[in-house]
Amino acid sequence: MNEFWQHCSALLERELTPQQYVTWIKPLAPVAFDADANTLSIAAPNRFKLDWVKSQFSGRITDLARDFWHSPVDVQFVLDPKAGMRTAPAAPSRPPSAGVRNAAAAVDAAVGAVQAAHSARGGGMPGLGMPTNAAQLTDDAADLDLPSLDANEAAAARRTWRPGAAAQAAGGESDSTYERSKLNPVLTFDNFVTGKANQLARAAAIQVADNPGISYNPLFLYGGVGLGKTHLIHAIGNQLLMDKPGARIRYIHAEQYVSDVVKAYQRKAFDDFKRYYHSLDLLLIDDIQFFSGKSRTQEEFFYAFEALVANKAQVIITSDTYPKEISGIDDRLISRFDSGLTVAIEPPELEMRVAILMRKAQSEGVNLNEDVAFFVAKHLRSNVRELEGALRKILAYSKFHGREITIELTKEALKDLLTVQNRQISVENIQKTVADFYSIKVADMYSKKRPANIARPRQIAMYLAKELTQKSLPEIGELFGGRDHTTVLHAVRKIADERGKDAQLNHELHVLEQTLKG
């Protein structure tokens, strides 16, 4: 029995991602084998893992048992009798949980992927003509938000990093440095939870923090609301301030930048505006889609971008969508965005959502039971902000009612949210959406046809069904014309693997996911 489990675990470790293996397979243990009845019992540490392993991995483990003993084996999954007495330990602030550590270890490999992707794009920027005439501006803006900077400071700031900068910014300068930069010192790489969904973006961010103005300029991060784009760019700024305390850094939301342009125009203060923004070492601009339709803002940002890149200063931009799909942005700016590295941040996978909840609970001084974390993560899938909001509701509900945090209490605290979430994306809707996207018939999803123009969309639909629904592999296979669960597993792994290597496929999947989520 133990020999089989060592063999089975080794095979599954090769087949699964590190996070999946550590989260689901490693905690299992064989507890009994009845040779007469050919029955193998495997124990799981808690009810959630028991149910999940039964639905997702029982078929594969049963196949491996049959191959090992050369006869059919009835694999039964049972709850560890000690499970009821266990509580999940508080997640350490550093290092992160095992699943997250394994994903973070993949960052080094992701750095190589980032470099390869960038090299494949080729260098150089196309030449641009002068910007078009500015549109008329309104005056509904906030005060011009520029820290003071005299001519001598501006001249001194036009250099790249200098060795003596750290000494000049030591001691009491720290608070004023953060005030000028608008950075949030809490948002660092250390407390950024890493998983498959964001490891490439994190790898690129670390490269930029280590080599500002050299590695990827600009760095463009895009993805939906609440996925960690703002956290990452603050982490870059904070890391750079640690390494180069004298660096001139500015984080600004695109709406505030628009307001600054408006006020500079009203006050005829564009010289001050340009002197400040053109002299930065690092400009972090969040949600650039808010530049849409604002011609004068785009013109001024174009000038700032050109000046910063020419001075080997780093520019980092975020958006909710792929650069070429942002409406109302001048093509010349789009070409500039595209000249650097563009990386997507996807919604977090299950293991990553659990790690986020455990980490957040630990930071609040709460020892969150693992079953509760898995329950919340299983039902809330869209983004980190939603997870954190749900956790706050649970903590408040527990405090107000003076009750321990259990799954039952969690259901009560989140009943309104869970009601909304239960209106789930259906496999049928996924099939129709993917069929429309790739111009094939919905019937092709169930057919046995294998031409590439049909098989590929079908595999993509299977992948999305696994990612966006709670259906098991056998259930998904049944909805795709009665296919075996191993066929679905192959499709899921194939698309997941290619997604990390193929930018076009990743973009198509991003569009499909956003469409399905409404």
Swiss-Prot record:
<dbReference type="InterPro" id="IPR020591">
    <property type="entry name" value="Chromosome_initiator_DnaA-like"/>
</dbReference>
<dbReference type="InterPro" id="IPR003593">
    <property type="entry name" value="AAA+_ATPase"/>
</dbReference>
<dbReference type="InterPro" id="IPR010921">
    <property type="entry name" value="Trp_repressor/repl_initiator"/>
</dbReference>
<feature type="binding site">
    <location>
        <position position="229"/>
    </location>
    <ligand>
        <name>ATP</name>
    </ligand>
</feature>
<dbReference type="GO" id="GO:0005886">
    <property type="term" value="C:plasma membrane"/>
</dbReference>
<protein>
    <recommendedName>
        <fullName>Chromosomal replication initiator protein DnaA</fullName>
    </recommendedName>
</protein>
<feature type="region of interest" description="Domain IV, binds dsDNA">
    <location>
        <begin position="399"/>
        <end position="518"/>
    </location>
</feature>
<dbReference type="GO" id="GO:0008289">
    <property type="term" value="F:lipid binding"/>
</dbReference>
<dbReference type="GO" id="GO:0005737">
    <property type="term" value="C:cytoplasm"/>
</dbReference>
<feature type="region of interest" description="Domain I, interacts with DnaA modulators">
    <location>
        <begin position="1"/>
        <end position="72"/>
    </location>
</feature>
<dbReference type="Pfam" id="PF22688">
    <property type="entry name" value="Hda_lid"/>
</dbReference>
<keyword id="KW-0446">Lipid-binding</keyword>
<dbReference type="Pfam" id="PF11638">
    <property type="entry name" value="DnaA_N"/>
</dbReference>
<keyword id="KW-0963">Cytoplasm</keyword>
<feature type="region of interest" description="Domain II">
    <location>
        <begin position="72"/>
        <end position="181"/>
    </location>
</feature>
<dbReference type="InterPro" id="IPR013159">
    <property type="entry name" value="DnaA_C"/>
</dbReference>
<feature type="binding site">
    <location>
        <position position="228"/>
    </location>
    <ligand>
        <name>ATP</name>
    </ligand>
</feature>
<dbReference type="Pfam" id="PF08299">
    <property type="entry name" value="Bac_DnaA_C"/>
</dbReference>
<comment type="function">
    <text>Plays an essential role in the initiation and regulation of chromosomal replication. ATP-DnaA binds to the origin of replication (oriC) to initiate formation of the DNA replication initiation complex once per cell cycle. Binds the DnaA box (a 9 base pair repeat at the origin) and separates the double-stranded (ds)DNA. Forms a right-handed helical filament on oriC DNA; dsDNA binds to the exterior of the filament while single-stranded (ss)DNA is stabiized in the filament's interior.</text>
</comment>
<feature type="binding site">
    <location>
        <position position="226"/>
    </location>
    <ligand>
        <name>ATP</name>
    </ligand>
</feature>
<dbReference type="InterPro" id="IPR013317">
    <property type="entry name" value="DnaA_dom"/>
</dbReference>
<dbReference type="GO" id="GO:0006275">
    <property type="term" value="P:regulation of DNA replication"/>
</dbReference>
<dbReference type="InterPro" id="IPR055199">
    <property type="entry name" value="Hda_lid"/>
</dbReference>
<dbReference type="Pfam" id="PF00308">
    <property type="entry name" value="Bac_DnaA"/>
</dbReference>
<keyword id="KW-0067">ATP-binding</keyword>
<dbReference type="InterPro" id="IPR038454">
    <property type="entry name" value="DnaA_N_sf"/>
</dbReference>
<keyword id="KW-0547">Nucleotide-binding</keyword>
<dbReference type="GO" id="GO:0003688">
    <property type="term" value="F:DNA replication origin binding"/>
</dbReference>
<feature type="binding site">
    <location>
        <position position="230"/>
    </location>
    <ligand>
        <name>ATP</name>
    </ligand>
</feature>
<feature type="region of interest" description="Disordered">
    <location>
        <begin position="155"/>
        <end position="178"/>
    </location>
</feature>
<dbReference type="InterPro" id="IPR018312">
    <property type="entry name" value="Chromosome_initiator_DnaA_CS"/>
</dbReference>
<dbReference type="GO" id="GO:0005524">
    <property type="term" value="F:ATP binding"/>
</dbReference>
<dbReference type="InterPro" id="IPR027417">
    <property type="entry name" value="P-loop_NTPase"/>
</dbReference>
<comment type="similarity">
    <text>Belongs to the DnaA family.</text>
</comment>
<comment type="subunit">
    <text>Oligomerizes as a right-handed, spiral filament on DNA at oriC.</text>
</comment>
<dbReference type="InterPro" id="IPR024633">
    <property type="entry name" value="DnaA_N_dom"/>
</dbReference>
<keyword id="KW-0238">DNA-binding</keyword>
<keyword id="KW-0235">DNA replication</keyword>
<feature type="region of interest" description="Domain III, AAA+ region">
    <location>
        <begin position="182"/>
        <end position="398"/>
    </location>
</feature>
<dbReference type="GO" id="GO:0016887">
    <property type="term" value="F:ATP hydrolysis activity"/>
</dbReference>
<dbReference type="GO" id="GO:0006270">
    <property type="term" value="P:DNA replication initiation"/>
</dbReference>
<dbReference type="InterPro" id="IPR001957">
    <property type="entry name" value="Chromosome_initiator_DnaA"/>
</dbReference>
